[in-house]
């Protein structure tokens, strides 16, 4: 099977997951599949309403599924197939997980047309914290930095999206 055919196969899996949610009143029409070396590592459909969890978007559910199965917080080199262009939260999670490629079906503009707009989030992320609609105030920085100092003293090493390659 050609590479293009494989991409289409996995995308159809994501679309099928999105369509499977239509019959459930709690579901939303989003699905995602994570693949590495031709193996499906995880998959998920949007469960935000069903689980009372606003972070349970299809991509996040798929990342959680794959990480749980692999017993790892990293999915380095994996590919995400999503029925729709991911929102900023889901895209950020992909970076944190080490996912290297994304294929998506509908654009965010199409999602917006059907009432699932996330333009506000894109716009808000470009603003300084004090200019955002969610009030953001930095407080007790010197005390808060102690957690990082303790982490370093304990020999901890951190993941950083700045290390993403």
Describe the predicted segments one by one.
Residues 41-48:
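Short beta->alpha transition motifs characteristic of CBS
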Residues 72-84:
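Immediate flanking context of iron-sulfur cluster ligation sites
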Residues 1-23, 95-165:
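Zinc-dependent deaminase
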Residues 82-101:
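Local cysteine-cluster metal-coordination motifs and their immediate loop/turn environment
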Residues 50-61:
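A short, polar/charged loop-to-alpha-helix boundary motif
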Residues 42, 59-68:
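Glycine/small-residue-rich phosphate/adenosyl-binding loop
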Residues 6, 28-30:
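Short loop/turn microsegments at loop-to-beta-strand junctions
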């Amino acid at each position: 099977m050609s590479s293009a055919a494989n991409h289409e196969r996995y995308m159809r899996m994501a679309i099928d997951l999105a369509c499977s949610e239509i019959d459930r009143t709690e579901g939303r029409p989003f699905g995602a599949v994570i693949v590495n070396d031709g193996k499906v590592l995880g998959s998920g459909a949007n469960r935000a309403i069903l689980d009372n969890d606003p972070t349970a978007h299809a991509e996040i559910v798929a990342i959680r599924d794959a990480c749980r199965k692999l017993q790892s917080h990293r999915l380095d080199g994996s590919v995400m197939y999503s029925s729709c262009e991911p929102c900023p939260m889901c895209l950020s999670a992909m970076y944190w997980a080490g996912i290297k490629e994304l294929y998506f079906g509908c654009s965010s503009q199409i999602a917006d047309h059907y009432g699932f707009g996330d333009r506000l989030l894109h716009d808000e992320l470009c603003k300084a914290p004090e200019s955002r609609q969610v009030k953001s105030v930095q407080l007790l920085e010197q005390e808060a930095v102690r957690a990082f100092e303790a982490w370093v003293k304990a020999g901890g090493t951190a993941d950083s999206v700045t290390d993403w390659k």
